[in-house]
Amino acid sequence: MTRLEQIYAEKVAPELKKEFGYTSSMQIPRLSFVSLNMGLGEASNNNKLIEEAVVELTAIAGQKAVITRARKSIAAFKLREGMPVGCRVTLRRDRMWDYLDKLMNFALPRVRDFRGVPDRGFDGRGNFTLGIREHSIFPEINVDRVEHVKGMNVTIVTTATADKEGKMLLDLLGMPFKK
């Protein structure tokens, strides 16, 4: 059991049960999975960039990243169906807990002028999406070897039914929201 998972079981779940008055332990919101997505618009012209992104996202996530391809051709973007446009990885169970622990305790505090994560990334159903502008905030990335600074989207999917429940879940786990 990972550190963050233990915090969830011992502190977060009982607090959520008390706060929202759940009668069953299965009603308590929990994390389903975390999805990391790196969209690379210029990847259609540069194959080296997509390979670099896959290697870096694999290092960050601890799991092999998959190349995402264009579903439709768009002439204005010089994009053909099947061209690589980014990469993504979905984390579940222990890898998810390890990644979230690393994100909240190591990566986010390394962001320049970090004052907290804005809470406007909730989708209305308790899931939270966060944009990261520089992937170099993660400890696995060697800043000297980075050729292109890339951003990524981190989506945390929960079983919560409302934003209030999802926010409290992430807040109790240690997500540094803006005050």
UniProtKB/Swiss-Prot annotation:
One of its GO terms (biological process) is translation. It holds the Pfam family Ribosomal_L5. Keywords: Ribonucleoprotein, Ribosomal protein, RNA-binding, rRNA-binding, tRNA-binding. Belongs to the universal ribosomal protein uL5 family. Part of the 50S ribosomal subunit; part of the 5S rRNA/L5/L18/L25 subcomplex. Contacts the 5S rRNA and the P site tRNA. Forms a bridge to the 30S subunit in the 70S ribosome. This is one of the proteins that bind and probably mediate the attachment of the 5S RNA into the large ribosomal subunit, where it forms part of the central protuberance. In the 70S ribosome it contacts protein S13 of the 30S subunit (bridge B1b), connecting the 2 subunits; this bridge is implicated in subunit movement. Contacts the P site tRNA; the 5S rRNA and some of its associated proteins might help stabilize positioning of ribosome-bound tRNAs. NCBIfam families: PRK00010.1 (NF000585). This is Large ribosomal subunit protein uL5. It comes from Solidesulfovibrio magneticus (strain ATCC 700980 / DSM 13731 / RS-1) (Desulfovibrio magneticus).
